């Protein structure tokens, strides 16, 4: 009885247009790597950047208030530190 060939597995999600990430260690035998499309990668980066920007703005006064209580940990402007400390005392965060 003749032995059949072992064909490489095709990634069904890649064939349907889905994105597949590269396995850094020990990929499955016959696994295929499909690079993400450039437009999708740029879109993801933009979304992540916008989220980070929003979080930074939201937490700026809180971080400054904590820093003003822990003298010497961070260098911040006096006005921003006082505003943050005031909000901490009032319990806005």
UniProtKB/Swiss-Prot annotation:
Q: Which InterPro entries match?
A: UPF0390
Where is the region Disordered? Answer: 1-32
| A matching Pfam family | DUF2462
A GO CC annotation given for this chain:
nucleolus
Compositionally biased intervals (Basic residues): 19-31
Q: Which family does it belong to?
A: Belongs to the UPF0390 family.
Report the protein name in the record.
Answer: UPF0390 protein C24B10.18
């Amino acid at each position: 009885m003749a032995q059949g060939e072992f064909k490489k597995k095709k990634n069904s999600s890649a064939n349907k247009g889905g994105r597949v990430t590269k396995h850094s260690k020990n990929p499955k035998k016959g696994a295929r790597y499909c690079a993400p499309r450039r437009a999708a990668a740029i879109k993801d980066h933009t979304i992540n950047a916008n989220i980070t920007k929003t979080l930074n703005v939201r937490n700026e006064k809180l971080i400054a208030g904590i820093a003003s209580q822990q003298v010497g940990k961070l260098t911040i402007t006096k006005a921003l530190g006082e505003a943050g400390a005031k909000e901490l005392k009032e319990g806005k965060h």
